[in-house]
Structure formats: C-alpha cells, structure tokens
Amino acid sequence: LAEVDPALFVALGLNREGESPWCGRLDLGGGNTVGPKRIASLRTMHQAAQRMLKAAKASDKVDAAAWLERSIAFWQAVVLVLSEQWAAPRQHMLCKGIGVYALMSLAGHLVHEAGERPVTVDYFLAKLSDFLDQIDWTNHGPLEGFGGSKGADMALKMILEVRKDIYTRLSQHA
C-alpha cells in the first residue's frame, strides 16, 4: 500500500498510530452525520494527504512511512497550537473537510520549505505558533461556506496570507 497509494497509507496511519492525534477519530463510514457536526472521514484525510504531497512537490517515489511521521508531527503541533479548537471539533472547522484539506496542504508547504532540515514537531511548532491561532476556526468564521477543492484552495490562500501578514509585521518590529 505504501508504494501503490502513499496518501492512503498516510491517512490510514493517522487513524491507526497511537501517537497520532487522529488515532481512532476519522469517520470510517457507516454513519450519516452531515454538515458542521461532521468530522473528517478517511476519504477526506486520503484526499488531504494527496494535497499535502502535491504541495510539498514530492517526487513520484515517495517514502510513505516518512510522510506518515511528518503528518503525525504536523498534527501534534496543530493540537498544541490550537488545543481549544481541537477539543471542540463540532464548533470548529479544524477537524472538518475544509480545515483538514487546507491544513494538510499547509503541511506540504512547510515540508517543502524545510528542505533538508529535519521535520519534527518542534519544527512545525516554530512555524505554526506565530500565526495559526490568529485564524478564526469557528464554524461561523471566515471559512464558513468554503467547500470542495476550490474552497480548500481559497482556505489555504487565506491561511498563507495570514501567515505572510504576521511575518511582515514581526519583521517590521524586529
């Protein structure tokens, strides 16, 4: 599976591995919760992992186990930075499709930025702690109404703009 579909390997691993914040949390199907009460499904995470690999400009020959480790580290950092939002998934877009798609794309961007540096929880914390909590992740925040891949692209663009604005302000005061 790791060689045939690395993104599915990552999605399944996020739901299976004990150190993953997603362990046992992905909707594996069978239920019919819809709308803002729904949390991410395995299918959503699979597609989000595909977005991450694309954003990272990963080669065709992907080390799926390494990408699973990076994904777990990323989500561990997200949970530390956005602990209140993570603890209340039904009130926040963080654990729903649009949030998962946008954040996994962001993970890909950050991995690409890292280059040869180690990609660890500390790396992601350093990158995320300056700006991620400045975004309103509530169901009625700026991500409300975003849907599908275009919505995910728009959400990612908004996240990257918030990040750029924060870094611009920080550099002006340095």
Where are these regions (language model features)?
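Accessory terminal alpha-helical modules
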Residues: 1-174
